[in-house]
From Swiss-Prot:
Transmembrane segments: none annotated. One of its GO terms (biological process) is glycogen biosynthetic process. This is 1,4-alpha-glucan branching enzyme GlgB. It comes from Pseudomonas syringae pv. tomato (strain ATCC BAA-871 / DC3000). Monomer. Keywords: Carbohydrate metabolism, Glycogen biosynthesis, Glycogen metabolism, Glycosyltransferase, Transferase. Belongs to the glycosyl hydrolase 13 family. GlgB subfamily. It catalyses: Transfers a segment of a (1->4)-alpha-D-glucan chain to a primary hydroxy group in a similar glucan chain. GO terms for molecular function: 1,4-alpha-glucan branching enzyme activity; cation binding; hydrolase activity, hydrolyzing O-glycosyl compounds. GO terms for cellular component: cytosol. HAMAP family: GlgB. Gene3D superfamilies: Glycosidases (3.20.20.80), Golgi alpha-mannosidase II (2.60.40.1180), Immunoglobulins (2.60.40.10). The active site is at D420 (nucleophile), E473 (proton donor).
Length: 741
């Protein structure tokens, strides 16, 4: 016969000393084997609970609340044991010093995650991971609560902690699901809005509290806790947009992107002179009419995933599934996207699968080992940014990032992702000297795991989120970035044309008197313009860190700077390739961009700045309306040089062709010297309408031009049967279209 202990409890009800000692020290790997209900071998159950600081615990019937039994405190303070004559659902009635609590027992529930979920996660191919891991508001056996699940295969113990348990890691140690390394627990009666973290015991002791890698919401930085969030419940009104999206994203369609930083586009100043960032709904009210007025087809948001340091602009993020709390709730962000779609504006997100910051509350050494990153710093540490590199060769990390992409595209109706820093992913020796990198298994410099990930990403996105886009920021000559994976490419829809950007800006920065010596910098991009499907990017990177604003890059006096800027934008909009322009460039902001301050909207009281903005609006309108400027972007037959070698005058002339054979003529004069009587060949006789003159008075130019129309002459030149005699304004671009009828 088993004698009772001094509390009157059958000693069989108390775990072995070694188990109890491990539980008390918060080191037990399987708390469910000790806590909760366990058969007594006679048809009844022992019930055990470890509730440090509890004064007393009783069991109540779940159905009617009657008292079933008292749990007696054992020799170990906080460890309570009791007995039920027969198994039945019960509640814990806990008496604390601060009051009474009635709740279900977290340790009365069996395994929660399905075997298929765990299998797909381990395989790296769970397409809806954000509805599986993390904090999931759910119901188990009719009880509302939150299921927590986190991947930490090398941890000795994982607990979920928060204000609901006094941030005490002894209260809710989790169950390890072998062999995937996922830990789980259901905490009854928890509500959305509660904050939490994970307390992880690694091989060498307790780690700093960790935020949830799968968090759907977060607290406002500098706080670093995760926040329980119910599944996104938002009534979308964008079905018309979603149905038309694939056509809008076709390579033959116009694509004009306004890049912005949500927090610094525009702010509100209070009576004390303090600046406040707008939330998503306020931003939508102000931004959408502005973007519509300018005629952009899409906006591109710099990363809006939660990030600890605002000065990283979002590129050093730690919550791949949670919109930052800086601008509101997940529902607020969904409302912003929905409002954009109803206004026929697409939304592209910058997305960062290349690296993550070293903050101790984040992914670094998540379970005490290099889990998300490479263990070897020669593979896993990015020297340029002092960040860690995702180990995309690990199936779980591969699947984690894949699920992040799908989360934004499917749950938030995002129209495209711009993948940041692709070049750093493709090469193991990126920005590294000899001896500072590890070759791949074939001895080469290519990062085979990242290449496999990018190809898989693009294939899966095409399948799971048809009609969306994935755009690469890739700065090297890697072949086939926008070629299909079936043909050996990486499978992106578009690639940023960094070569065009660097060469064209270097040309524009030259004093016009020297441009004849750099003529090829403006024309060389047409040698490779069809090697990829390109976006022409004038992004945030070009207006920070001492590079000067776009207008301040331009040479000359004030008038020439504005004229150069207008000419450059007109050249960009008529050059093959989709368009991207960073906020502030559309009206010629003088200052470099500062993420802590709003744009210099006061400049809109000056005619020159208004003129640049009006030009951008007209360029976008003409770009959308004139098929020749977008239909054959990816086809070399859509572009034809007329004059590419007039170095002495710095004049360029070319035709753009539509699918039905309609041409547009573009003539650029990149010097401040007007050219009168300048002859340019054209393929059609008759009248040619001057669609745009970047020197027009309406843009605050000098208004030198051709009176809106020019009649061709029967004088062949430049391989054409007819020609136009033009007045070329200084530092200006002209666009002509043959007049019908």
């Amino acid at each position: 016969m088993n004698a009772p202990d001094k509390t009157g409890t059958d000693r069989r009800a108390v775990p072995a000393a070694v188990d109890l000692d491990a539980l008390i020290r918060a080191e037990h790997r399987d708390p469910f084997s000790i806590l909760g209900p366990h058969d007594d071998g006679k048809g009844g159950q022992y019930v055990r609970a470890y509730l440090p600081a509890a004064l007393s615990v009783r069991l109540l019937a779940r159905d009617d609340g009657r008292e079933l039994a008292e749990l007696h405190m054992s020799d170990v303070p906080g460890f309570f044991v009791g007995h039920l004559e027969q198994p039945q659902p019960y509640l814990l009635k806990i008496n604390w010093a601060g009051g009474e609590q009635i709740t279900e027992d977290p340790y009365s529930y069996g395994p929660l995650l399905g075997e298929m979920d765990l299998y797909l996660f381990a395989e790296g191919n769970h397409r809806d991971l954000s509805s599986c891991l993390g904090a999931q508001v759910t119901s188990v056996d009719g009880v509302e609560g939150v299921r927590f699940a986190v991947w930490a295969p090398n941890a000795r113990r994982v607990s979920v902690v928060g204000s609901f348990n006094g941030w005490d890691g002894r209260r809710h140690p989790m169950r390890l699901r072998h062999p995937t390394g996922v830990w789980e627990i259901f905490v009854p009666r928890l509500q959305p809005g509660e904050v939490y973290k994970y307390e992880i015991l690694g091989a060498h002791g307790i780690l700093p509290l960790k935020s949830d890698p799968m968090a759907l919401a977060t607290t406002l930085p500098p706080d670093t806790a995760s926040k329980i969030s119910a599944p996104l419940k938002f009534e979308w009104h964008d079905q018309d947009w979603l149905q038309s999206r694939a056509g809008r994203h076709d390579v033959a369609a116009p694509l004009s992107i306004y890049e912005l930083h949500a927090g610094s586009w525009q702010m509100e100043q209070n009576d004390e002179g303090q600046w406040r960032q707008y939330n998503w709904r306020e931003l939508a009210d102000r931004l959408i009419p502005y973007v519509k007025e300018l005629g952009f087809t899409h906006i591109e948001l710099m990363p809006i995933m939660e990030h600890p340091f605002g000065g990283s602009w979002g590129y050093q993020l730690l919550a791949q599934f949670a919109p930052t709390a800086r601008y509101g709730s997940p529902e607020d962000f969904a409302a912003f996207v929905d409002a954009c779609h109803q206004a026929e504006i697409g939304v592209i997100l910058d997305w960062v699968p290349a690296h993550f910051p070293t903050d101790t509350h984040g992914l670094a050494q998540f379970d005490g080992t290099a889990l998300y990153e490479y263990a070897d710093p020669k593979e896993g540490f990015h020297q340029d940014w002092d960040t860690l590199i995702y180990n995309l060769g690990r199936t779980e990390v591969h699947g984690f990032m894949l699920a992040s992409a799908l989360h934004w595209l499917k749950h938030y109706h995002i129209d495209g992702l711009r993948v940041d820093a692709v070049a750093s992913m493709l090469y193991r020796d990126y920005s590294r000297k000899a001896g500072e990198w590890v070759p791949n298994r074939f001895g080469g410099r290519e990062n085979l795991e990242a290449i496999d990930f990018l190809r898989h990403l693009n294939d899966v996105v095409a399948l799971e989120a048809p009609g969306t886009m994935v755009i690469a920021e890739e700065s090297t000559a890697w072949p086939g970035v926008s070629e299909s994976t079936q043909k050996g490419g990486l499978g992106f829809n578009y690639k940023w044309n960094m070569g065009w950007m660097h060469d064209s800006l270097q040309y524009m920065e030259e004093d016009p008197i020297n441009r004849e010596h750099h003529h090829g910098k403006l024309s060389f991009s047409l040698v490779y313009a069809w090697s990829e499907r390109f976006v022409l990017p004038i992004s945030h990177d070009e207006v920070v860190h001492g590079k000067h604003s776009l207008i301040d890059k331009m040479p000359g006096d004030r008038w020439q700077k504005f004229a150069n800027l207008r000419a450059y934008l007109a050249f960009m909009w008529t050059h093959p390739g989709k368009k991207l322009l960073f906020m502030g460039c559309e009206f010629g902001q003088w200052r470099e961009w500062n993420h802590d301050e709003q744009l210099d909207w006061y400049l809109m009281q000056y005619a020159e700045h208004v003129g640049v903005k009006k030009l951008v609006g007209d360029l976008n309108r003409i770009y959308r309306e004139e098929k020749a400027l977008h239909q054959r972007d990816a086809d070399p037959t859509g572009f034809q040089w007329l004059i590419g070698d007039d170095k002495s005058n710095s004049v360029f002339a070319y035709l753009r062709w539509s699918n039905d054979g309609e041409p547009l003529l573009v003539v650029a004069n990149m010097t401040p010297v007007p050219r009168e009587g300048y002859r340019v060949g054209v393929p059609l006789q008759g009248a040619w309408t001057e669609l745009l003159n970047s020197d027009a008075e309406t843009y605050a130019g000098s208004n030198i031009g051709n009176g809106g129309e020019v009649i061709s002459e029967d004088e062949p030149v430049h391989g054409m049967s007819a020609s136009l005699t033009l007045n070329l304004p200084p530092l200006a671009v002209l666009i002509f279209k043959p007049k019908k009828g």
